[in-house]
Amino acid sequence: MFNFRLFSRRGKSLGLLAIVLLLFGFYSLKSSMPVYSNSIGSPSAHSSSYKGVSKAKTSPQDPDSVVMLIVSFDDHYDSSRSDSSSVFLDKVLSDRTEYALRHGYTLVHKKARDIQARYGVYGTWSIIPALRETLAEYPDAGWIWLLDAKAVIMNPSESLKDRVLKPEKLSQHLLLNSPIDPLKNYIRTRRKMDPSDVFVITTSDYNGISTRSLLIKNNNFAPFLLDAWNEPLLKSAGFDQAERSALSHLLEAHNTILDHVALVSPKVLNSYTNSAVDLNYEEGDFLVILQDCENAAACERIFDNYYQQRKLPAIKKQLSEETVDEQS
């Protein structure tokens, strides 16, 4: 005898399975397409004047124009001062100002606490919406350069173009077929890369891919990457290296993203203090990331030490009453 009850149960199960497969297919298709978020404010939504720092004008589609982004966190401020000021951060901004003025770049300062309040993100995850805001605010910039506040530009006379953005320079510095994460040797950069296909330039260290000195080309790929990187599922995944691990996961899971991310030697964009020989700062390196400073006072002492060692050819352009967007 035909078992109608069994047939009914099987039919329901197959129906549910079909729905799940359809939803999965729709989500996969959606996630593979560029996403343009409307959650970011208008170009002037979070802008205010910051006296003494450079704001350069960029021409439409200028491939050499750069917006330098610095995101400051609470540990960059002096907790002993009631006005929440920071001698350390002032020195960092002065260093970045000098570099921006010299090369005609724009400098943007965003406070992590304000980013966190606007978007409900925490810790270093705030660099992602900070980058996304900057893209919206400067649509004509060629590149966005996110550089950690705990860094000193040691060779301010060298432009990013001459350092790494020229195709011949980028080709020279590319790490091809190189592990992105030392614990996942199978995740590697491409064996061949055309500089014209490179939309993200960064480095890796013993903790995997780094976000402390990162360049993102301002094209259609940038919002696609940042929106994928900012997915709530990634933020709730409990990655041990937060946004760094999330970016590594995206490179592992999405060939479209991996195709456009280039690694260069840490010595090119991201030398460290107190690190292994292949990562440690040496005289002549472009910049140095300050390790092992957990508060503004400690960072200031280390900053001063390296700041005095910089290469300082004569600066032709004096600091003036120009402005930079400080996000508040």
UniProtKB/Swiss-Prot annotation:
It is found in: Endoplasmic reticulum. Its main location: endoplasmic reticulum. Residues 1-32 form the signal peptide. GO terms for cellular component: endoplasmic reticulum; Golgi apparatus; Golgi membrane; mannan polymerase complex. Keywords: Endoplasmic reticulum, Glycosyltransferase, Signal, Transferase. Its EC number is 2.4.1.-. GO terms for molecular function: alpha-1,6-mannosyltransferase activity. GO terms for biological process: protein N-linked glycosylation. Gene3D superfamilies: Spore Coat Polysaccharide Biosynthesis Protein SpsA, Chain A. It comes from the Eukaryota. InterPro entries: Glyco_trans_34 (IPR008630), Nucleotide-diphossugar_trans (IPR029044). Belongs to the glycosyltransferase 34 family. This is Uncharacterized alpha-1,2-galactosyltransferase C8D2.17. It comes from Schizosaccharomyces pombe (strain 972 / ATCC 24843) (Fission yeast).
